[in-house]
Amino acid sequence: GLVYTFTLRDGVKFHNGNDVTCEDVKYSLERAAGLLDGTPLVATLQTIQSVDILDDKTVQVTVDTPNTELIYSFVTAIIPAGSGEDAEANPVGTGPFSFVSYTPQEGIVLAKNENYWQEGLPYLDEVDFKIVGSADTALLELQGGSIDIYAYLTDSQANELKDSFNVISSPSNVVQALFLNNDYEPLS
């Protein structure tokens, strides 16, 4: 389709406690599409022609051409309107965890978002993402107990760990996609 209409969920707040508004959604999508400065941050959002606020809970996005990947691209982060450059140094979002710190070459620390919209989540108080230089180092850190999860095991690593760790595997080609046929109503 060429026009997408989104209704904001009630009770969604940013990590700083402020309500998420249509102005925030408009700003974030226009910024990501390059409508504010001519530099798109998300290539598939370049097709956005306009983002219009219909009322206090509804945003309408108009694109110039049908794009089967567009829906996937709407998962772009919604940030407070006008946050711009500050968004990189002091990120504020709506997810289950909020930014605490980032140390280059070491990792990022996130804390539980007490304002998260989905009741009962998150159930963890903190998540630490550790930057590890190689798969072999990550395997050693997992075995040594300094990390709890490692998502990208090779088959040989999984076999090595299966007797002492809960190794969960599933077939995947690492491609996840939803494509809509925009040649026919109601999506054309």
Question: Locations of the language-model features?
Answer:
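Alpha-helical secondary-structure segments
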Residues: 21-28, 58-62, 95-96, 124-126, ...
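Aromatic- and charge-enriched surface segment that lines or borders ligand/interaction sites
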Residues: 1-38, 60, 188
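Surface-exposed binding/hinge segments that line
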Residues: 5-7, 41-83, 101-103
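Sec-exported extracytoplasmic/periplasmic mature domains
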Residues: 13, 30-37, 115, 143-147, ...
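Solvent-exposed, polar/charged alpha-helical surfaces in well-ordered, non-transmembrane soluble domains
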Residues: 18, 23-31, 72, 125, ...
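Extracellular/periplasmic solute-recognition and catalytic clefts
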Residues: 50-51, 100-109, 128-186
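Gly/Pro-rich hinge or "lid" segments in bacterial periplasmic/extracellular proteins
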Residues: 72-128, 136
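Extracytoplasmic
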Residues: 1-3, 20, 46, 54-56, ...
